[in-house]
From Swiss-Prot:
It comes from Salmonella typhimurium (strain LT2 / SGSC1412 / ATCC 700720). It comes from the Bacteria. It is an enzyme of class 1 (oxidoreductase). Pathway: Cofactor biosynthesis; adenosylcobalamin biosynthesis; cob(II)yrinate a,c-diamide from sirohydrochlorin (anaerobic route): step 7/10. Disulfide bonds: none annotated. This is Cobalt-precorrin-6A reductase. GO terms for molecular function: precorrin-6A reductase activity. Transmembrane segments: none annotated. Belongs to the precorrin-6x reductase family. One of its GO terms (biological process) is cobalamin biosynthetic process. The gene is cbiJ. Its EC number is 1.3.1.106. Catalyzes the reduction of the macrocycle of cobalt-precorrin-6A to cobalt-precorrin-6B. It catalyses: Co-precorrin-6B + NAD(+) = Co-precorrin-6A + NADH + H(+).
């Protein structure tokens, strides 16, 4: 078995946890991450790490060149384009594709101040009902879209403490008091103090699941009487037995894959 046989895609803590299982099973693999931050998060995994974004055509070429037999999409739940390209590439190259996606916990909380949005545009429409200070805990990728959609609001961005991210915030017009560069997940107490300190009138977040500290983000917001808008996840492109929603489910799928590989 070579390192191209299995490809794990994603610079997330979920992807790293899957790699640990592959390490424990002595499976050779490659972890593909998009950014240096994702590479750093991989830590001391045993597999090969490749860094850089792959478009559809590049994915197909990589899969064929490395004779890949199994792809595990552990990319961020909201990385729709990555998942879409992976699905197409695996179909083209004839490679098995599994999707690992943590449970979202969206139904665990209900509250009059908790709103669910299906898109950024939907979230912007809801946010316009509230005060001027909008705290975004949705990552840095779509900040330009938020800026355009909520031009009349004061946007506060909680983002990763990465130089290129802070530079992007600055280029989009975020001031010194509007950029909060922090690496989560955070405790409920931390978030409660943070919301108070930044004087947020409304908080916008994503259904990040337990690993992303979803309840620790949302509950303190609601307890403080602050409206919270949660952007729901896109519908998974992979369904059935290849949609894995826990580490235990992945362990079972890995066992079946190893058994089939020996036949």
């Amino acid at each position: 078995m070579n390192e191209g046989d299995v490809l794990v895609v994603g610079g997330t803590s979920d992807a790293r946890a899957l790699c640990r299982q592959l390490d424990a099973a002595n499976v050779a693999y490659t972890l593909s991450v998009a950014t240096p931050a994702g590479k750093a998060l991989a830590g001391d995994i045993k597999g090969q790490v490749r860094c850089g974004r792959l478009e559809y055509g590049q994915m197909v070429a990589w899969l064929k060149e490395n004779r890949t037999r199994w792809v595990i999409d552990a990319s961020h739940p909201y990385a729709e384009m990555v998942s879409h390209n992976l699905l197409r590439a695996c179909e083209t190259a004839g490679v098995l594709l599994s999707r690992y996606q943590r449970p979202e916990q969206l139904s665990n909380l209900t509250h009059p101040l908790l709103y669910t949005a299906r898109s950024i545009a939907d979230a912007c429409e809801i946010a316009r009902r509230f005060g001027p200070r909008v705290l975004l805990t949705t990552g840095s990728k779509d900040l330009a879209v938020w800026r355009a959609g909520l031009a009349e609001k004061t946007l506060l961005a909680r983002v990763l403490p990465v130089a290129e991210v802070i530079q992007r915030c600055s280029e989009l017009g975020f001031g010194v008091g509007e950029i909060f560069a922090l690496c989560g997940p955070f405790s409920a107490d931390f978030n409660a103090a943070f919301y108070h300190q930044c004087r947020a009138d409304v908080v916008i977040t994503k259904a990040s699941g337990a690993e992303g500290g979803y309840q620790e983000k949302v509950q303190p917001c609601l307890d403080a009487g602050i409206p919270c808008i949660v952007i729901a996840r896109p519908t998974p492109l992979v369904t059935g037995d290849e949609l894995l929603e826990s580490q235990a489910a992945f362990a079972q799928r890995l066992s079946r894959w190893l058994a089939a590989a020996k036949e």
